[in-house]
């Protein structure tokens, strides 16, 4: 079992990565003793893992569950209220703990519910998708979507522990696994050139779910995320680099309707647009764009935006992006494999050129 620490002073917490961790009551015990436990999951994950995690936790306290519909389109205030209603109807107090058992949607919603309920209760992340294991479960970003923008209503709120059981990936649909790989590849592009090269060399091992390859890839992503979050918890500086591909990607998700494109698929296409923007600005050359495209394609990811999206469709959503400052769109762009920076002087005419030529 691999352990990584997110260093945030009194709010520090461990990430555990390994196989069959959902049956490891010893690791969870210190976070659950004498607490009332509410597991939040969805209709897809519940038949697979809810009974297992309930049995693991039953010896530590009273365990209940709430099961939500599955999909990004349900990550909204109405379904957040379902969690609050369950907590209130069953008289959960501040000594309770919420457990997020699922992917990024469940993790984001459960974390936000924990941040809000009685002004803050403990929560635990047990991510079951690759995307949530390498990205959304770590760092304390919690939110729900609004019809006008993704993750617009939320809070920074850290979990007590992140428990990553890589065996969950064996029940993950291939499309969901590929979507998670978009975030894995992102880390190589924006932070670690050696890791990017390792990914290029280990496509087959990852696609066949080789145990050691998965643990290494997930661990490296979590190490990078933990390092970045420890430096910049609330995204005032270096943490913004983790948004590589996300400004374009969020525009795709919002325009196409949440759930029609998976988040990772939108990030993949958005990462290519970011690379093409960097090339248009002279920051990188065509060979780097090609390496990025080829690695994304190796994992069966989209490398272009939907044909139905034009420049006007993109720009109206990008102007609402959370990174906009002083009315200026700020983009994370690669400056090399393994490096990226934030740019706020990218003109809309440059963006129009890139989007029209993509």
UniProtKB/Swiss-Prot annotation:
Its EC number is 4.2.3.4. It catalyses: 7-phospho-2-dehydro-3-deoxy-D-arabino-heptonate = 3-dehydroquinate + phosphate. SUPFAM superfamilies: Dehydroquinate synthase-like. The keyword Secreted does not apply. One of its GO terms (molecular function) is metal ion binding. Binds 1 divalent metal cation per subunit. Can use either Co(2+) or Zn(2+). Pfam families: DHQ_synthase (PF01761), DHQS_C (PF24621). Pathway: Metabolic intermediate biosynthesis; chorismate biosynthesis; chorismate from D-erythrose 4-phosphate and phosphoenolpyruvate: step 2/7. Gene3D superfamilies: 3.40.50.1970, Dehydroquinate synthase-like - alpha domain (1.20.1090.10). NAD(+) binds at residues 70-75, 104-108, 128-129, 141, 150, 168-171. The keyword NAD applies. Zn(2+) binds at residues 183, 246, 263. It is an enzyme of class 4 (lyase). One of its GO terms (cellular component) is cytoplasm. It is found in: Cytoplasm. InterPro entries: Dehydroquinate_synthase, DHQ_synth_AroB, DHQ_synth_fam, DHQS/DOIS_N, DHQS_C. Keywords: Amino-acid biosynthesis, Aromatic amino acid biosynthesis, Cobalt, Cytoplasm, Lyase, Metal-binding, NAD, Nucleotide-binding, Zinc. Catalyzes the conversion of 3-deoxy-D-arabino-heptulosonate 7-phosphate (DAHP) to dehydroquinate (DHQ). Belongs to the sugar phosphate cyclases superfamily. Dehydroquinate synthase family. This is 3-dehydroquinate synthase. It comes from Shewanella baltica (strain OS223). The gene is aroB.
């Amino acid at each position: 079992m691999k352990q990584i620490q997110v260093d945030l002073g009194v709010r520090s917490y461990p990430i555990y990565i390994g196989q069959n961790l959902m049956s490891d009551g010893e690791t969870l015990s210190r976070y659950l003793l004498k607490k009332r436990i509410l597991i939040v999951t969805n209709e897809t994950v519940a038949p697979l893992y809810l009974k297992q995690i309930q049995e693991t936790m039953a010896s530590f306290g009273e365990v209940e569950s709430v099961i939500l519909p599955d999909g990004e389109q349900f990550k909204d205030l109405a379904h957040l209220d379902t969690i609050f209603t369950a907590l209130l109807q069953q008289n959960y107090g501040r000594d309770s703990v919420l457990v997020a058992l699922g992917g990024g949607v469940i993790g984001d919603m459960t974390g936000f519910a924990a941040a809000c309920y009685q002004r803050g209760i403990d929560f635990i992340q047990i991510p079951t998708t690759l995307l949530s294991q390498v990205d959304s479960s770590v760092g304390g970003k919690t939110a729900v979507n609004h019809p006008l923008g993704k993750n617009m209503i939320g809070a920074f709120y850290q979990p007590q522990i992140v428990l990553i059981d890589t065996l969950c990936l064996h029940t993950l649909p291939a499309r969901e696994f590929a979507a998670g790989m978009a975030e894995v590849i992102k880390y190589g592009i924006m932070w670690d050139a050696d890791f990017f090269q390792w990914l290029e060399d280990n496509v087959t091992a990852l696609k066949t779910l080789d145990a050691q390859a998965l643990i290494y890839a997930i661990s490296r992503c979590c190490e990078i995320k933990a390092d970045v979050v420890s430096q910049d918890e609330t995204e005032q500086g270096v943490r913004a680099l983790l948004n590589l591909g996300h400004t374009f990607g969020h525009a795709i998700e919002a325009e196409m309707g949440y759930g029609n494109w998976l988040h990772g698929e939108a990030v993949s296409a958005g990462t290519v647009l970011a690379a093409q923007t960097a090339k248009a600005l002279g920051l990188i050359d065509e060979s780097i764009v090609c390496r990025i495209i080829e690695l994304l394609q190796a994992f069966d990811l989209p490398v272009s935006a939907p044909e139905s999206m034009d420049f006007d469709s993109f720009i109206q959503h990008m102007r609402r992006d959370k990174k906009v400052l002083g009315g200026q769109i700020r983009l994370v762009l690669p400056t090399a494999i393994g490096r990226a920076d934030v740019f706020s002087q990218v003109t809309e005419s440059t963006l129009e050129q890139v989007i029209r030529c993509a």
